Regions:
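Conserved hydrophobic alpha-helix
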Residues: 100-107
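ATP-binding glycine-rich loop module of kinase domains
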Residues: 10-38
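Conserved C-lobe activation region of Hanks-type protein kinase-like domains
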Residues: 172-232
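Catalytic-loop of the protein kinase fold
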Residues: 108-126, 130
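Activation segment signature within eukaryotic-like protein kinase domains
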Residues: 96-97
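Activation segment/activation loop of eukaryotic-type protein kinase catalytic domains
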Residues: 125-164
Length: 267
């Protein structure tokens, strides 16, 4: 049964006989399978840590050059948000954001930038065919990359990098052609929180109306969006979150605990 299809892959639901459990099979549509090969490399690296599956990383069952078999998870945050008429309670959204941040921090600790933080890539666990909202996972590492070399050095800052990701939630720097680092994941994370609380983002209408916008144009629109338009009617802590994310440096390790404590203050 087909679950999802994108420009690069098709995802099917299946059933494993030994041991008996539901699985998903992701097939690369590209001739050379480059996108899925990258995702497999990322998953293999993360799962060198035996505790990875307890930190919000989907469990990998098997893989080949053009296919990836994973555990079947529940619905996505996007699915739940749609089913809730684009309305999460404030506290539910913030609690969810804290779980998301914990997973992003873990992915970064493995030397990886996710590169496509958005509601549809966060999946809930599944228990007996039903979504388990206590467990959250971050999926889809097709656009992910290592930000650390094997010797531990950070990748260099670059300009003129082709944009990958989802424009609606992407950071303004990556849309503008700058190399991604941890700050881009956290900027996207900030936009996701705003979206889950308010149900929209300031640039949604412009992105929808102007069909000829390229990534650079979208980045410029985000860069010129005023702070007050993003955090209007939200608690004062969101101004601190905005300033924190907006002043992150390319090479610097983010202070995740500071950000988490700001979120906890709002509960």
């Amino acid at each position: 049964m087909k679950l999802h299809e994108s420009s690069s892959s098709i995802v099917y639901k299946g059933y494993q006989l030994h041991p008996k459990k539901m699985i998903v099979l992701k097939i690369d549509k590209m001739t050379r399978g480059a996108s899925l090969e990258n995702e497999i490399d990322i998953y293999r690296h993360i799962h060198r840590d035996p505790l990875a599956s307890t930190q919000g990383i989907p469990q990998i069952i098997a893989y080949e050059h053009y296919g990836l078999v994973m555990e079947k998870l529940g619905s996505s945050v996007h699915d739940l948000f749609e089913a809730s008429n684009h309305q999460f309670s404030f506290k539910f959204a913030v609690r969810l954001a804290i779980k998301m941040l914990n997973i992003i921090k873990y992915v970064h600790s493995r030397g990886i930038v996710h590169g496509d933080i958005k509601p549809s890539n966060f999946l809930f666990g599944e228990n007996n065919g039903k979504a388990d909202y206590k467990r959250l996972y971050l999926s889809d590492y097709g656009f992910s990359k290592f930000f650390l070399f094997k010797n531990g050095d950070h990748i260099p800052f670059r300009e003129g990098v082709m944009f990958t990701g989802t424009p609606r939630f992407a950071g303004k720097w990556s849309l503008g052609g700058l190399e991604q680092s941890r700050r881009e994941d956290l900027e996207s994370f900030f936009y996701v929180i705003i979206y889950l609380i308010k149900g929209k983002l300031p640039w949604d209408e412009k992105f929808t109306k102007k069909k000829d916008l390229d990534a650079y144009d979208m980045g410029a629109i985000k860069g010129h969006t005023k702070k007050k338009d993003l955090i209007k009617d939200l608690p004062k802590e969101f101004e601190e979150v905005f300033d924190f994310v907006n002043h992150l440096l390319f090479y610097k390790q983010p202070d995740y605990e500071f950000l988490k404590n700001l979120l906890k203050k709002m509960l």
